[in-house]
C-alpha cells in the first residue's frame, strides 16, 4: 500500500513538472542575438538575425466542408472533395 501511494505521488509530481515546463501557444519564444564581434554561425544570417519559421499549429480537420463545388465521385458521394481538380 505504501509503494502504491509513493507511485501515485511520483506520477502527480511528474505531471506538475511537465505542465510547468510547457510553453503555451500564445507565448512567443525569443532567441538570443549574438554580439557584433561573434562569428556568424551556420544557422544565422549575416545581419545577426536568425531565420526562424513559425512552428506549425495543429488544428482540426473540417471534414464536413467541401473543397469544390463539383464532385468527381472519387470520394463515393461523401462530398469531401479532396481529390477534385480545381
Curated annotation (Swiss-Prot):
GO terms for biological process: defense response to bacterium; intracellular iron ion homeostasis. Residues 1-22 form the signal peptide. Keywords: Antibiotic, Antimicrobial, Cleavage on pair of basic residues, Disulfide bond, Hormone, Secreted, Signal. One of its GO terms (cellular component) is extracellular region. GO terms for molecular function: hormone activity. Its main location: secreted. Pfam families: Hepcidin (PF06446). It comes from the Eukaryota. InterPro entries: Hepcidin. Seems to act as a signaling molecule involved in the maintenance of iron homeostasis. Seems to be required in conjunction with HFE to regulate both intestinal iron absorption and iron storage in macrophages. May also have antimicrobial activity. Belongs to the hepcidin family. This is Hepcidin-1.
Amino acid at each position: 500500500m505504501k509503494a502504491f501511494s509513493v507511485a501515485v505521488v511520483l506520477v502527480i509530481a511528474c505531471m506538475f513538472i511537465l505542465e510547468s515546463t510547457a510553453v503555451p501557444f500564445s507565448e512567443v519564444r525569443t532567441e538570443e542575438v549574438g554580439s557584433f564581434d561573434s562569428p556568424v554561425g551556420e544557422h544565422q544570417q549575416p545581419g545577426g538575425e536568425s531565420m526562424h519559421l513559425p512552428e506549425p499549429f495543429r488544428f482540426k480537420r473540417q471534414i464536413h466542408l467541401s473543397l469544390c463545388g463539383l464532385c468527381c465521385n472519387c470520394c463515393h458521394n461523401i462530398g469531401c472533395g479532396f481529390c477534385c481538380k480545381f
